[in-house]
Amino acid sequence: MTTPDVDGAARFLAGNARVLDRRRFERLFSGGDARPVRDAVAAFRNSDGGFGHALEPDGRTPASQPAAVAMALGTLDEADAWDEELVAGACDWLAANAPAEGGASFVEPTVEGWPRAPWWEAEEGRPASLFTTGQIASTLHARRVEHRWLDGATDLLWRRIDDLDDPGPYGFRGVLRFLQHVPDRGRAEQAFERGGRLLFDRDMVALDPDAEGEVHTPLDFAPNPDSIARRLFDEATIEAHLDHLAGGQADDGGWTFNWLAWSPVAASEWRGSLTVDALRTLRANGRL
């Protein structure tokens, strides 16, 4: 069993990661305070209450974007750096920029003209994204936030889940995040029992830890022992993927990713973010 080198990860982050992820590591693994994480997140905030400035490294526009809001709220939550002012502003921005059907788009048109990954293109009509909407709604429900945007997003997600057929792996990850924390637990369990097998029926998950390319693993869908989708995988499969994750630490101390590295800066920022994520997953599963 590979034992991750936490000190090596710390050195990698010190030499390669942005302040945000260095502060995340400090908070989560070195007993650091929550306030520096809050302040690091706030540095990406705009006057409209949303978040931008490449907080999500693949969209390098200064304008507020839903994916950046999702990352901001998730970071505040994980570090227990929850800030009512930042959260209220983000929710107000979401409400002011919601698609007609509710929720949040994946990419807003304000990305136009700025460096971005090839998949960061605003769709015509600004449809709601299961991925961003599910992530944001999940975090807000976990924190028991009440806001009109969340009410509309929850209704939208339930409608989409009731007719779920082929959401794609990212969309399904958003659905699972939502089902993890939405207050109506009975409905969430029923929805999961109906739709959980789509993970296999639509070939969204790679069960082989050595699968190559931009694949999604069981740990992407069920990173923690209490994840709603963990029951879909046997213990041997989870342990094999944990072994693979632990063994994925590079010689420089960091972890990397399996999608297109379209920008050296974005790649470095993603590696910093995902290094902290990898350590979190390994610790949650008893590997640290």
Label the model's feature ranges.
Residues 1-288:
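Preference for long, amphipathic alpha-helical scaffolds in soluble/luminal domains
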